[in-house]
Amino acid sequence: MAMSLQGSRRASAGSRRRTSPPVSVRDAYGTSSLSSSSNSGSCKGSDSSPTPRRSMKYTLCSDNHGIKPPTPEQYLTPLQQKEVCIRHLKARLKDTQDRLQDRDTEIDDLKTQLSRMQEDWIEEECHRVEAQLALKEARKEIRQLKQVIDTVKNNLIDKDKGLQKYFVDINIQNKKLETLLHSMEVAQNGVAKEEGTGESAGGSPARSLTRSSTYTKLSDPAVCGDRQPGDPSNTSAEDGADSGYVAADDTLSRTDALEASSLLSSGVDCGLEEASLHSSFNLGPRFPASNTYEKLLCGMEAGVQVSCMQERAIQTDFVQYQPDLNTILEKVGQAQVCGSVLKDRHSELDPHPSGPRDPDSAVVVTVGDELEAPEPITCGPATHRPAVNSNPGLPVSVVCPVEEEEEEAAAATTTEKEPKSYWSRHYIVDLLAVVVPAVPTVAWLCRSQRRQGQPIYNISSLLRGCCTVALHSIRRISCRSLGQPSSSTAGGSQL
């Protein structure tokens, strides 16, 4: 019995093994066992069905779908299937663990980046707050500076008002000084212009008329008048009162005449203070035979007559001043040298008397392009007696030149006669003027620490030192060079 039982168990086990559905090694999830059991069930059911052939025909996979069944070598036991499933699950577990670790590392990296970004953001916020605070402080400072600027502007505006007043006063004083210097230049240049022998009235006060003057040429009847040598009107006090001088003596030197002309051309306001000065210049009926004085007298009368014919006079304020008598005497001395040579050439003089005018007024004509009319200046009563005209038949024409060439020539003669000296009379003054500007440079060179390659000397100080050493010879050479043209001009005037 026992043997039969064991044999039946083995047969049943063999049948079970044979009837067990095939499990492939590739099927890790056991899907093949389910399909085999379903197939076996369907086969069992097919035995009871009335049409077993058709069911068997359609239940075979090879017949229906063309899929070959797996080989018996690939079939696994359930234990092997479990082991395969366990291995597969372990592999998946390892994969998930690896992925989890990767995710953890990524999370850590992101956390570190986030922390860094937070720190950077905090720093940026701190900088932004600091910038805002600095901006607020800067705005406060700007407001304060604006307030300071406004206060300074207000103070400057107040001061500018006072400065403008000062500038106006200074301009007024400058204008007065310009008129004074202009009149002094006229007084100095009058004598130099009168020494020229080639011009008819180049050095006379008629030159001081404006360039827009219509009367540039005057005839003898209009300017000087037709007077005979024996005409009593030549010695009348009414006609002689126009020049503003008193006739007292018959013997008058050329010096007095030139001094009178310089005073008239300089525009001196003849008042009570100058009465004694004017009374010293007396014009007589007889004058020495000098062409210089002849031109001077004719020019004076022509200038006065032109101003009367135009009937244009503007009363303006004039700055009173006292001319330097020393300069006038020096000019007169130079004129005497020229006049003494020409004294013997002319034996007769051409008088130029003027028409009747107001005896209490004299006209001062100033040189300049800006003035358009002469200025009348009140003077004391005086008379004038011109010389007797020995040649009354010839008309005398006075031409008032306005060309620039003659003015430049006259200016050149004055500059040649008056050389400028850039050195003083004392040697010590010139020495100090050369040496003193170099003292700060020398002191700086002595006290400062010189670098390598820096020159010891300064070019300006070196030049001043050379000039200091040769100052004596330089002064002598410059004086000689300035003295030569003056001597040459003096010699030319004597010739």
UniProtKB/Swiss-Prot annotation:
Highest taxon in the source lineage: Eukaryota
Membrane-spanning intervals of the chain: 427-446
Matches recorded under InterPro entries: Syntaphilin/Syntabulin
Main localization category: membrane
Subcellular location: Membrane; Synapse, Synaptosome
Low complexity composition bias: residue spans: 7-49
GO annotation terms (biological process): negative regulation of endocytosis; vesicle fusion
Coiled coil: 79-161
Bias kind Polar residues: ranges: 207-217
Modified positions (Phosphoserine) in chain numbering: S200, S204, S219
Location of the region described as Disordered in the Swiss-Prot/TrEMBL record: 1-74, 191-244
Residue list for modification Phosphothreonine: T214, T235
Keywords: Coiled coil, Membrane, Phosphoprotein, Synapse, Synaptosome, Transmembrane, Transmembrane helix
Pfam families documented for this protein: Syntaphilin (PF15290)
Record's GO cellular component terms: cytoplasmic microtubule; membrane; mitochondrion; neuron projection; synapse
Membrane topology category: Single-pass membrane protein
Subunit details: Binds to STX1A. Interacts with DNM1; this interaction inhibits the binding of DNM1 to AMPH and DNM1-receptor-mediated endocytosis.
Role noted for this protein: Inhibits SNARE complex formation by absorbing free STX1A.
PANTHER family: MICROTUBULE-ASSOCIATED PROTEIN/SYNTAPHILIN, SYNTAPHILIN
Name of the molecule in the record: Syntaphilin
Originating organism: Mus musculus
Gene symbol of the encoding locus: Snph
